[in-house]
Each structure stands twice: as structure tokens, then as C-alpha cells.
Amino acid sequence: MMRRRKVILLTIVVILIIIGFKMLFYFHVDPSSEEFTNVDLCPACYGRDLCPQFFHGDISLLGISKLRYLKSSKNVFLGKLSNNRVVLKKLAHDSEIANMDKLLCDKANLSPCDVKDAVKILIHKHLEIPDSFHFKNLIKTLDSSTDITRCPSERLITYLQDQLNMKRKLIDFEDVGSHGLGELMYGLLLNPEGIILQAFSQAEGWPFPQYLGSCGRVIVEEYVGKTISYYEDSPWKQRVDIAYQLLLIAQMLTENDSGFSLYMTDVNMDNFAVRSDGTVLLVDVESVVIVDRFNLKKDQNFLNKRHHSKGQFCKDCLNFSFDDLCNHSQSDHNYYAICKGLLVPESYYSPKGFLHEIPENVNTQTNLSVLVQECANPSTLFNRFRVVPKILQIMKSLL
């Protein structure tokens, strides 16, 4: 009798183990599969340059990212590439991706929907128009709502296309013509992060994560580190270093030699991260408005003057006007976003302010708290442009 019970118990254990392995296999996410990358849907995708690494098993997922039903709602996965930690992003919710596919098929009058053919139809239709291919107009007809398309210009579109094509040629990427345009269109419409990381690359000094490549509907970028929310109660020296870099980021995006101003429309504390060497980077670049300053100067009707952000906030959000950003040669928006949004007490993403508890001796010698408040709530128009360089100089002297 006891022997029979042992056999039954052992059988049950074996069955449970088999079921467990099957369930683990079912719930397991395989990054090398077409189901994960959707590379078969290109050119309705972000690119294909990193596909060999995916298909050869050089990219693996870490932790709960391995499990199908515990994935991030935004489709963000932690992984490894050549023993380096990386972040894999599909850059949208599943529902957003499905809605974009439907939009593209509807615009191409394609039913049943085959989104890769829809993209080819839309691109070829515009390529066939002699001497009048205006990619900007194509984007407009598709009712894009991404921030990067809010202030469109032919120079910006050409710049983005040239940057992506140049990087494809460096890796001997095939069909950089209509196929590349399809990928550019798809990224601009759904989420332009991959495009921005390539066009404004870290190698050229921009404060963004390194873009490592893409396969289908997945991009891969470097894992930077913990977000700045982790450092909110760190020692003063470390916090002032981070604040200094945040203002440098705001300054570079606003005032640079590219002819483009990049305005951050989402500056919450989880959108900035700190590398192991202490470097601060903007790690979520989906919400960036790009203004072509050169193009504006050619327009006789544009407002050839600076724009002042008034700082009218709603709870936990940044209140601004796309028209104001698009139609002025320069705005203090980035300074307003960092100072009012993160640094001062009662900022909307840091109630006590990232620069809380400034040492008394520092305040006495530098008047830093007053200057940061002036950046957040200026007493005169455009004073942020005058006060930010002073703040940066003081912070640099404290490091």
C-alpha cells in the first residue's frame, strides 16, 4: 500500500514538473522570435540593422522581462547584449501599435490590413509625384500627434532622413530609399525616440542614451542607470552635481549650433537617469518638440523674438503651448521645466525640490536659492536667460 502511494505521489510530482516546464515555456518571451520583433512587418517598423544579433541569440532578456504576461505596459524590457545591460523598447502600448496599423491601412485604402504593404503604398504614391515629394505633407495627412511632428519643416525631415541613411550606409544597410522612408514615417508617427537617438546621437555630444540598433518593432539602447528619483535624498554634493547637469542639458537643447531647438515636454524624475560614472542623461526622449530655428528666420511672418514660459501649472503636468514653441526663434521653456518642475520646493515632480536643504554657508556666499527661485518664477521677462548662466557658474564652483 505504501509503495503504491509513493508511486502515485512520484507520478503527480513528475506531472507537475512537466506542466511547470510547459507553462514556463509558454510564458517565456523569446527575443529572437518574429513574434517578439515583428520584423516581418517592415517597413512598418523601426529598422533591421540589429536583427543578426537577435536571431543569433546575442540578445537575452533579464528578470521579469523574460515573462510574457509580466511585461511593462509600455513594452520596455531589460536585457543583455554582449554582456552589457541594455534596454529594449517597442515604444508603445500594444493598443497604440494596433491603432497605428489600422490608421496606416485606412489611409492606404487597404483591406484586409497588411500594414507593411500599406506603408509601401503610401510611400510609393508620394514618390511617383514628379519633383514634388514633400515628406512633411505626407506626415501631415496621417494626422500625427507625436511631439516631433508639431513643428514640421522640410529641413528637419531632410536632416532626419540624411542622418538615418548615413548610419544605414555605415552598416551596409540595403534599400535605404523607399524602405528607409517607410521606417522613418512609422517612427515619426508612433514614437520618434529611435529616430531622435540616431539623428541627435550621443557620439555627437547630445545628452541621450547610446542607440545600439533595432530589429523590426524593437529598438535597443544602452541601460544608463537609476533614475534621479533614487537620488532625491542623496548628499548635497551629489544632488548639486545632478542639478548642474540637468541645467546643462536644458541649455544645450535650447542653445546649440545645429539650428534646432529641442524642447522637453515631459521632465518627470523618471525620465532622467545617472550613469555609474555620474553622467546624467535624458532617457525618455519621446516627448521632445524640435523647432527649426533656421527655417523660422526665413519666414517673414514668424515671431522673430524669444518666448517666455509663464509657468502656469496643472497638477503633475507641464502647461505649455505648441504654437508658442513652434513660432518663436527661442524659448526659455527648458529652463522653466527644469527649475520649476524639479529643482525648487513644491515643484510638481519633487514636492521638496531636488535642491532642498541648500547648506546655509553656500546660500550666504552665493544666494543660490534666490537664483533658482528666479529661474522658476522670474520677476522680469526673459530673466531665465540671464540667471541660468549665473546658476551654472555657481554650481560648477561647488563641485
Enumerate the language-model features and the residues they cover.
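Conserved structural core of kinase catalytic domains
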Residues: 119-194, 198, 206-249, 292-294
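Amphipathic alpha-helical interaction motifs in eukaryotic regulatory proteins
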Residues: 197-202, 212, 247-254, 283, ...
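Juxta-kinase regulatory segment immediately upstream of eukaryotic protein kinase catalytic domains
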Residues: 6-84, 90-143, 177-189
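Conserved beta-strand elements of beta-rich interaction domains across eukaryotes
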Residues: 83-86, 92-96, 216-218, 225-226, ...
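Helical subdomain adjoining the active site within ATP-dependent kinase catalytic cores
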Residues: 2-43, 312-399
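Conserved alphaE helix
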Residues: 232-268, 275
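Catalytic activation segment of kinase domains across protein kinase-like and atypical kinase folds
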Residues: 258-329
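Protein kinase-like catalytic core scaffold
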Residues: 86, 207, 219, 281-284
